[in-house]
């Protein structure tokens, strides 16, 4: 069964190889604290605290696998995983902090703009894990408050039992064909950070933008919440086409022989960089710093790549041979600070155009 469909048009979109070349050029070093290695003193202090609370929008099973691996490496520390959609996590943390409740130690979000807001509010601690010193400058906060702990792609896809490769959509434009009406499943930007970022990128994309999304909204879309859901609906045959499922969920399902093929659309594919940071007022500051060091380590990042099918900015990880290299995919990208300014507009226009 086809695993990938790659369709590339000669449009002014950034390829991943161009993106990373631009990220890595120059010798600029981000300001803020120097990278902090794991020391025996940090491990001892973390074990005394005994627990770390991790709010994340990573797929639950992957987050639990990460927690288990950390607990095996550092016996005596329990990771409490609180998993939800990125926008729900943002709402929860905002409500908790407004009520002077400080439960969370480490936060991860597929919507990096959330971390920009936490930083503005003074909720994050300036802390740079050891491996983050090797990160591309544009994938870490210049003041050391957060960095990109993972990336994924918001991809098109189709059910290979319901659609033949020759008939499958190859581009976003293809999905406006009347034959796809009532046949597309799509996630929601008000719930999912991945979809918030992808929607922002598409709204700025040449030849697409809000006029395209307005037309898509007339295709009787099956609307779901999380970006983890479209690949699952696709695998079950509830809809033959998905508009914006997570690449990593689709790959995980393909690994189980689910009838899914991924499409990297001709116009470009939204690249969604997540981010993670330590909360300044978290109840377990040492365990938080030890955990986030593990999250960004080669071991932690390799787990996300191998088990979770995510993309990583750690130069020490090994990409699965079966996966299309990021350097071969045209991508759209987002500036988290600019995206953060557009959140309300995205929610308003999406609700207007899609009726949800």
Q: Model-derived features: where do they sit?
A:
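Extracytoplasmic ligand-binding site segments that recognize negatively charged/polar headgroups
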Residues: 53-67, 79-97, 102-238
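Short, low-complexity disordered leader/linker segments with a strong preference
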Residues: 1-49, 356
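Extracytoplasmic "Venus flytrap"
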Residues: 32-40, 47-65, 274
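C-terminal capping/gating helix-and-loop segments adjacent to ligand/active sites or protein-protein/ligand interfaces
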Residues: 301-356
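A bilobed periplasmic-binding-protein/Venus flytrap-type ligand-binding module shared by bacterial periplasmic
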Residues: 155-162, 199-203, 272-284, 303-304
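Periplasmic-binding protein-like
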Residues: 151-152, 180-191, 213-217, 223-224, 256-282, 294-318
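A ligand-binding cleft/hinge motif common to bilobed small-molecule-binding domains
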Residues: 113-117, 240-259, 308
């Amino acid at each position: 069964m086809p695993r990938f469909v790659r369709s590339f048009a000669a449009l002014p979109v950034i390829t991943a190889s161009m993106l990373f070349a631009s990220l890595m050029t120059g010798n600029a070093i981000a300001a803020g604290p120097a990278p902090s290695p794991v020391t025996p003193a940090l491990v001892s202090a973390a074990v005394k605290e005994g627990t770390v609370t991790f709010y994340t929008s990573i797929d639950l099973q992957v987050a639990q696998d990460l927690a288990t691996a950390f607990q095996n490496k550092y016996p005596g520390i329990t990771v409490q995983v609180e998993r939800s959609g990125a926008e729900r996590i943002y709402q929860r943390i905002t409500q908790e902090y407004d009520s002077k409740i400080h439960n969370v130690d480490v936060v991860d979000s597929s919507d990096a703009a959330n971390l920009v807001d936490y930083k503005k509010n003074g909720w994050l601690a300036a802390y740079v894990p050891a491996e983050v010193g090797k990160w591309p400058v544009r994938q870490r906060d210049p003041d050391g408050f957060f960095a990109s702990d993972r990336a994924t792609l918001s991809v098109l896809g189709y059910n290979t039992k319901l659609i033949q490769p020759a008939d499958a959509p190859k581009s976003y434009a293809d999905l406006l064909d009347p034959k796809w009406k009532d046949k597309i499943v799509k996630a929601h930007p008000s719930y999912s950070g991945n979809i918030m970022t992808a929607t922002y990128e598409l709204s700025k994309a040449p030849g697409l933008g809000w006029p395209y999304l307005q037309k898509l909204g007339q295709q009787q879309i099956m609307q779901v919440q999380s970006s983890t859901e479209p690949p699952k609906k696709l695998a079950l045959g509830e809809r033959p086409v998905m508009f914006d499922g997570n690449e990593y969920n689709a790959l995980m399902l393909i690994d189980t022989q689910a009838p899914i093929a991924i499409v990297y659309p001709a116009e470009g594919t939204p690249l969604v960089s997540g981010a993670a940071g330590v909360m300044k007022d978290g109840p377990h500051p040492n365990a938080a710093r030890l955990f986030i060091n593990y999250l960004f380590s080669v071991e932690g990042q390799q787990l996300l790549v191998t088990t979770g099918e995510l993309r990583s900015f750690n130069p020490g990880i090994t990409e699965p041979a079966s996966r299309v290299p990021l350097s071969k995919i045209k991508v759209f990208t987002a500036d988290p600070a600019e995206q953060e300014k557009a959140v309300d507009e995205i929610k308003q226009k999406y609700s207007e155009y899609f009726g949800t």
